[in-house]
Amino acid sequence: MSTANDKRTVLDPFGTTVIEDYDKLYVEFGIQPFKPLLNQVPNPSMYMRRNVIFGHRDFEPVLNAMKNHEEFAVMSGIKPTGEFHLGTLMTAREVIYFQKQGAKAFYCIADVEAYEDNKIPFEKSEKYAAGNIADLLALGFDPKEGYIYQQSKEQRVKDLAIIFGRAATLATMKAVYGERHIGLYLAALIQAGDILMPQLKDFDGPKPTVVPVGVDQDPHLRFTRDLAARFRRKYDFVLPSSTVHKIMKGLDGSPKMSKRNQMSYFTLHEKPETIAKKISNAFTGGKPTVREQRESGGIPEICPVYELDMYQFEEDDKEIIKVYSDCKAGKLLCGEHKQRAIENVVNFVKEHQQRRKKYVDKAKELLQVE
């Protein structure tokens, strides 16, 4: 668990992350701003253009590989604890973006972490995993240009974790992750193995590798980069890079969507009418009355409905700018905006659910499960 001098800044990949000012992360945690690199990125993603990806760690080697059409990898995954939600959607889209830019894509089913962090039995996580991979394929992941695997069944990852354990003291693990049971420290070492496996000779490594993460997962990257430096002589590792994205607010206005509050989030498998109800009841940056909003405008910066557009469901950058300016000017009322958002989200979810049905068998085949 990483904390800064400001008690309101906490990055905890296994717990609660608290961020009041993203700009402070540049100084306090050494995350580098992404914006200065934006004009150099061939075909930047929606998240890059909109500053949703606000930071990075050592992205330049990946950027150079993209510009020079050289080999590089993208690595991410999912903890199989349930259905695809907006956080996993964001990361999956980032993986698919880099895959389309030429990366070899590695996607991990983090079943060891699911067991250690969430007490999900391996048999149960296997069932979740098949559904998660069907979602990934429906979103556009190309399995011919990727490698999908389960942590518990990938011996190379486990071997790396054992080797990395020689360089990880209990004091280091406590400093990075806080006081945890040993199993979570093991899961962190395995995740380091996930991140660095694409650089093994079995996969034509070493090579630049980018890991798209939410800011709450940044401690994993710092830990893994330290291990990569320590084992560079043995494996010739290139220090792994990352892109760092912001965390979406809960629909209820909370700092983060949480399964503890069903009204704060939705999955890609919920009924459209349920999703519509949740958006209709969402917190907004609007004023108490129509008159006040017309006169002084809304506050899109704190509005989860605006974030649905900004992060996920409005592809047109010009429309995003218009929604923002109309809200600030009092031209767009919250009720009208919610109806637009409901239409965009429900249309996307309906189409996704239909596409996903076509990939269930393929997902089971890739994972070798029934």
Where are these regions (language model features)?
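Short, solvent-exposed polar/charged micro-motifs at secondary-structure junctions
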Residues: 156-162, 223, 252-255
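N-terminal Rossmann-like or analogous alpha/beta NTP/dinucleotide-binding catalytic cores
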Residues: 2-73, 80-200, 354
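Non-catalytic terminal extensions that flank enzyme cores
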Residues: 1-78, 225-280, 285-292, 296, ...
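A short, terminal or domain-edge coil/loop segment
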Residues: 126-134, 158-172, 196-212, 262, ...
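Structured ligand/cofactor/substrate-binding pocket environments in proteins
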Residues: 84-89, 96, 111, 120-125, ...
